[in-house]
Amino acid sequence: MAALHIVVVAPEIPWNTGNAGRTCLAVGAQLHLVEPLGFSLDDRYLRRAGLDYWPRVRPEVWPSWAAFAEALPDLGAAYFFSSRGARSFTDVSYPERAVLVFGRESVGLPPELLDRHADRTVSIPMRDPELRSLNLSTSIAIGAFEVRRQWATRGL
């Protein structure tokens, strides 16, 4: 079982998910997709963004957040990425098993999910206060590589 899990709740844009899959392969993470999906897993744009790596990604698809949440305790400590997070993602010391949760491109994670997990909601600081958010696949890469950087520093 992977030590790092990347979860995308209701992704809308196939090429972001394809890029996220490539990032997961690069960092040794398992990709989880929580329905509804805004595309088919057979989408040509998804495959194009994932290049010839996509067949190796093997994302786990969950019918709902509730279904995924049942499996969550077995996967590791979860951190919810949102522009509304009060704490920077770099201020977290990620444990040996971690789950990074991201929302859909247009609106992010549902407010009720962020409220329920406010103590584990983190943000990626941005210098431009008028910028609402980063691209989803960019955010996933930033978060995933920070976890791997910390783990490497600790010899994990």
Residue ranges and their predicted role:
Residues 1-156:
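Post-transcriptional modification and biogenesis factors for structured RNAs
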